[in-house]
Amino acid sequence: MKDAFSESKIAGIKLRNRIIRSATHEGLADDFGNPTEELIKKYEDLAKGEVGAIITGYAAVMQNGKSPLINMLMIDKDEKIPYYTELVDRVHQYNTPIFLQITHCGRQTFSRTTGMPTVAPSPIKDKLYNEDIPHELTDSEIDEIIKCFVIAIERAKKAGFDGVQLQLSHGYLLSSFLSPHMNKRNDKWGGSTENRFRIVKKIMERAREKVVDYPILAKMNGYEKSKDGIKLEEALIIARNLEKASCDAIEISCGIAEEGFVGIRGEFPFDMIAQHNHLMQKMPKILYPFIKPVLKHSFASPEPRYLYNLDSAIEIKKNIKIPVIVVGGIRKLEDAYNMIQREQCDFIAMSRPFIIEPTIVKKFKENKQQQSKCIDCNYCQIGVEKTPVKCYYGKM
């Protein structure tokens, strides 16, 4: 019988167990987007903690796709390959596979960060990130982005990564192409689900020509809260399209940034938001008492929610044969066991539990602990805008 600690494989890559560290922006790259010694040590700690596999924080494939969050990884130049090789070799010492998540942030960045205009499939301003209306991408610009993704995949392979993960969720560029909420084009890149998927299909086709059977995973939304966003019915189509395009595994997440994701659960850290968020710092403090209830109502769940992507993952797993990874509000070992044993998913992924406890998998396996120590204070999610990720444990 399958369980959370049974060995398994993704595209032939052996995992010691079925618990994966989901991509988490650490904010620990250097000024050029190379991994630093501090970041490598964090990944070593995860590997020592016997995690099944690591998916890195997101790495941008080109300069205009760089995140406004502090010290993002970049995979935009060949000169970066040796830095990543060092990272991979250090992690592989502990027999832990590591996948590089690659992305383009699209409209979820600032021109002052990238030094270039922000871009998107459609000229629709992001409510949280973008101070300007993004430039609508032309055919030639889309083709250049496709090329950059493919080259990034080649670089990841040369660096020794066990595979890559395409970031198709959370409102970044590829996510915004997939979502009818953000993609209002009426050409071959917009309209139908097939057209909105076209950019991903082209990346996969061209990547397969270059790297053949090199593992390519994807992270996608099972749903979006926006009325005209992706819903489960369309997510099923996207998942099937990914499988047809020779994707090797799919991680199920949800939401986009301007919806507040569903990440703010439980405590609403308004003081932290006021201190770190770029929009709040532009507002007079006298307005804070009026702003707080509006933000809390719009972006936060009134109480912690757990396993909030499981229903989507269950339905998607019924429709495809490639492995399904579920992330989102997983805190208890019992839940991880149940999801795997009931074959509701093939792997489970976590982020915040690894921020507070990099060795949580080992503790679970040795029966020293049954639940993450994460208290869902949400400070880590807010603080990462200006400082490297860490656990605040409810204290600023």
What are the roles of these predicted feature ranges?
Residues 1-396:
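Flavin-dependent oxidoreductase catalytic cores
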